[in-house]
């Protein structure tokens, strides 16, 4: 498992944690209760996806004013907000990871980071555009 230090700064508050960096997840997922607590800005777009467990998940797209990943600050990051199932939260907790945030590939790419599974961390890389 790859871990990353994150800090979400919303309109009304912020939240710091060590989260799972999941390259199998397209978007960063934020639990609804945390999104409400820090006050994210909803875009009005509904999202549907299938979780790793095979269950359908309904989410809302939102924008976090600032999402910091391993010290790299990303302004106005789009995230998926949903109720993370308790079974998933339990697995994350048992792995020593935060249960409210799962980093997705789009966030990692925007931060110019790749997953280093051998080290269990993220690594900065040079960004380039083709």
Identify the meaning behind each predicted range.
Residues 1-130:
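Pepsin/retropepsin-fold aspartyl endopeptidases
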